[in-house]
């Protein structure tokens, strides 16, 4: 089964940048909100769904199992189910399901569970192809909130920020052979973050770009050689790097909360040049910002303190507009519009413009709390909630009616 540019096969979409490139969406919704196509009860977890062709892949926890399910994307009907035991317990009382969004590539589904269980599953049949217990294999210490970064899968490699070691050698980042799970290389002593790596090309050279617990890191995906790095983390031990790097041409935008802030760098060969950095513009706690026409759109501030929704000039870091105490959420760029899903379960549509925030449509689509990033494919939105007794996954038709 091939993956098209209109699918949503991984975290943050086809290019892992939060951009939807499918058919246009409606500019307004009925009074009751977008048409609900189907909904399905789901288990625990912060992992959003992914869509490839007519398949939706859901990764959640049901009882004491982490479960991977394939559904018909248009009807919600089950296709297959794959499960394995889990004993993960959250030390802070949060949801105990998986955090990392699955990846669909080359006819396989890759999942990375809360305890570091990395699995490759056949997309057509649901049969296990290979699996690695990365926590045990690489002696990974339990982090604050479990394993959360979705692996980067490209060119026959699965690259993950494991944060461990391999027989005395550093294994902060590990590359596995995509078809067999064999270890290709291990690199760096960087601990695991909650951010997902992205693939980028600088000066004709393919690069794996990561924001680990220690900071920004660029690796040669073929060998694991370090191409560039820059420390970027809070002085507080009880802090996280969670938003993914955003690549814009030869520049990389990174952001974190906990008095860390944001920075924009230019990549020239193996050299990083800082363009600007500050903590007052766009400190992303969990959700990754999107870029449109030279403006960043995203959340500024800690999730638990009701962050602001902001527009920030990419070139300078100047704040163009800010909606204070907006509540946390996720933002997706669809054409020239922002699709915002708040933790409260409210979906909003607004033009991506730097002069003011002007919502065009809004609707309550799920009960709180919604932390998982939604999937948007062929004009259909797939979103799920968690932290309730009645978690559900919903499919909405956002196409013009």
Outline where the language-model segments fall.
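Noncatalytic, solvent-exposed loop/strand surfaces
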Residues: 3-401
